[in-house]
């Protein structure tokens, strides 16, 4: 199985003694960064709903974005992202064999880099997939990426001999994957909290659970989609009544 997750807004830029790989869409990232660096502070604030300080930070990041970055300004993607999903993934605690498997089977969808492997070297950035950044290809990043992400995922799935993609990404990011171009069966786990017999999705918990599901798949080297139902991290249990064949639902008592 191939697994996809979203990136994170927050970064952990601690130095890592880990060999990195080059992103498949490095040239596109450079092109997009050059487009973004021409925006005014006001444009950046509006583009991503940023405060003044965050707009300045990300303007400076785009201005400093290197065409051929060295190790001093890059970090491995799965270790650099630090949001809720990555609390569940806990990439830093994966051993070398688990990380090798993740490098083949886990992908991070990115507004700037398109598709990343866990050890791909990224520069510090923030550019959400839903951003309406105008380029020669259109008025949004969805226009920019077109069917490229789908074609890349098809090819990478073919390399590992699978026709199944487990979608642990958010709707914002998986929306960049063109369904008409994608040739894979998509399974989307759903994580819900049961509060008084009324199951509901709580964003913070769901993000962390999606990362935990990705970790579960990596650590067990799962290839059979039916094995996903055995996931029980964080107190979640598979609920057959709420589930559909390609949308397994996991439920736990409300944690609030």
From Swiss-Prot:
GO terms for biological process: response to hydroperoxide. InterPro entries: YaaA. GO terms for cellular component: cytosol. Belongs to the UPF0246 family. This is UPF0246 protein SPO0106. It comes from Ruegeria pomeroyi (strain ATCC 700808 / DSM 15171 / DSS-3).
């Amino acid at each position: 199985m191939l697994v996809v997750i979203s990136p994170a807004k927050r970064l952990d830029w601690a130095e890592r003694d880990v060999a990195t790989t080059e992103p498949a869409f490095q040239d596109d990232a450079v092109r997009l960064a050059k487009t973004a660096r021409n925006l005014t502070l006001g444009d950046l604030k509006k583009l991503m709903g940023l405060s003044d300080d965050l707009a300045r930070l990300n303007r400076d990041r785009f201005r400093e974005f290197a065409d051929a970055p060295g190790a001093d300004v890059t970090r491995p993607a799965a270790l650099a992202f630090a949001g809720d999903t990555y609390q569940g993934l806990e990439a830093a605690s994966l051993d070398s064999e688990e990380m090798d498997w993740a490098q083949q089977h886990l992908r991070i969808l990115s507004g700037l880099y398109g598709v990343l492997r866990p050890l791909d070297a990224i520069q510090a950035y923030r550019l959400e997939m839903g951003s309406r950044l105008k380029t020669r290809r259109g008025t949004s990043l969805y226009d920019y990426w077109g069917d490229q992400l789908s074609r890349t995922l098809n090819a990478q799935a073919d390399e590992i001999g699978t026709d199944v993609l487990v979608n642990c990404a958010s709707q914002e990011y998986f929306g960049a994957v063109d369904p008409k171009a994608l040739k894979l069966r998509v399974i989307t786990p759903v994580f819900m909290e049961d509060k008084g017999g009324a199951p509901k999705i709580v964003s913070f918990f769901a993000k962390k659970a999606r990362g935990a599901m990705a970790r579960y798949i990596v650590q067990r080297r799962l290839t059979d989609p039916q094995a996903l139902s055995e996931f029980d991290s964080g107190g979640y249990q598979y609920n057959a009544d709420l589930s559909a064949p390609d949308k397994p639902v996991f439920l736990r008592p409300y944690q609030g």
